[in-house]
Amino acid sequence: MDASTSPIATTARIVMQAKGLVKRYGQVTALDGADFELRAGEILAVIGDNGAGKSSLIKCLSGATVPDEGEIILDGRIIHFKGPIDARRVGIETVYQDLAVAPAMTIAENLFLGREIRLPGFAGNVLRMLDKKRMLEESVMRMNDLKVGIRSMTQAVETLSGGQRQCVAVARAAAFAHHVVILDEPTAALGVKEGNMVLELIRRVRDKGLPVVLISHNMPHVFEIADRIHVARLGKRGAVLNPRKISMSDTVAVMTGALPPEQLPAECLA
């Protein structure tokens, strides 16, 4: 399923929302009343020029930063994050640009990194021994479910290509998220073939029912995969665009401020 046949509709349920987020770093205002809306079953790309506030927005949504003002709403309930662990507890998983995979560990160990399954009884509760067999079995199941073609879950991540490593990171997020997956530049520094591999995996995550927030500077990838495009500008939500109705050049013009959103035809807005 590509973006042109995505199931997303304007009436889709709002999964995650932010209203009036403000974030200041000393004298610098990174977010100045930013709004955000993520719908069920969509891939929402977040784009913006340097200093537009997209990174601060994503940090607030993932719990990495606490906003000074405003509110974040998940499934209709206002939530407050003190840190990324709080976001993970409510089913929001984030893959940052630096991947955060452990190269020397196996794929199975990476999938359960920080969420290791322990053996039952004395062995697990007292001796803290891991149930490696169960983790391996579940890793195989989860990777097969997302159709990630990696030969063995017992091979070290350092033996994988860049695209395969990114797929491991995305699959780990999808395995434990039950609300939202946030991906920060998932195809950065990847070749064409590996970039396409990651994009296809992101589609499958979406098609499994998890909405995806995709932060990217790669406009061809954004237009290939996104259902809607959130444009961050000057610390606010500049516009939300329909990639099937607006050109890439006009999108860049909106992002840089050369084209005011109010001058766009209504069909270009989403």
Question: How would you label these PLM feature ranges?
Answer:
Residues D2-A270:
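Glycine-rich phosphate-binding loops of nucleotide-dependent enzymes
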